[in-house]
């Protein structure tokens, strides 16, 4: 299902308190301070920010509430936070320091009822389920967890339907096949899932140039997330929005 204005969402992947960006989830490189990056995106016209502690679930750590608190003090656009969220108290702590939505991934796979409980407790509008997918055969994608380290064996399309049925208000869909490549979003799986579910789908993984955003929006994505092209200033967010506007894609321009 498509929603009116398409959203541009920079992603802050954080490891050890620093923004990093790798290729296909490995080969990480330092991209700066998360608070400074958040301030810059807020000023540049990002619609939202997504902030992911990419090692929290793998290492069994809790969300980095302190960093989130500092970021939330400085930005005035919706902030989604993920990484290490496995209990209702984790969600409460994050919402309490100023984040607007939480993103759950590994915990949702291991305990699907957690989606129901968190949605019922806090409202579906603030529960995002992140789904990392990889194509394993023609027309077949599996769900991966732990930063792409573990194949769950779950069918990605069926899992997307299930998380929405359980109360997810949004899906953050990352293609591991395109992530970090700058060769374009994974149009095929993004379009399939976007047309299948009745909640917004955020496309993630593969953005390299402005045309990629236009393409994924024309194929039903409601929002597009990217990291390195924004972190390293390869694409300016306002320039991107002007480009999309000229190409008849509805975006918010401040």
Curated annotation (Swiss-Prot):
InterPro entries assigned to the protein according to its UniProt record, in alphabetical order: Aldolase_TIM (IPR013785), His_biosynth (IPR006062), HisF (IPR004651), IGPS_HisA/HisF (IPR050064), RibuloseP-bd_barrel (IPR011060)
Keyword entries, A-Z: Amino-acid biosynthesis, Cytoplasm, Histidine biosynthesis, Lyase
Disulphide-bonded residues: none
Catalytic residue list: 13, 132
Chief location: cytoplasm
Keyword flag Amino-acid biosynthesis: yes
Lyase as UniProt keyword: yes
GO CC, any one term: cytoplasm
GO BP of this protein: L-histidine biosynthetic process
Subcellular location(s) of the protein: Cytoplasm
NCBIfam families xrefs: hisF
Record's function text: IGPS catalyzes the conversion of PRFAR and glutamine to IGP, AICAR and glutamate. The HisF subunit catalyzes the cyclization activity that produces IGP and AICAR from PRFAR using the ammonia provided by the HisH subunit.
Quaternary structure, from the entry: Heterodimer of HisH and HisF.
Membership in a protein family: Belongs to the HisA/HisF family.
Name of the molecule in the record: Imidazole glycerol phosphate synthase subunit HisF
Origin species: Nautilia profundicola (strain ATCC BAA-1463 / DSM 18972 / AmH)
Gene from which the chain derives: hisF
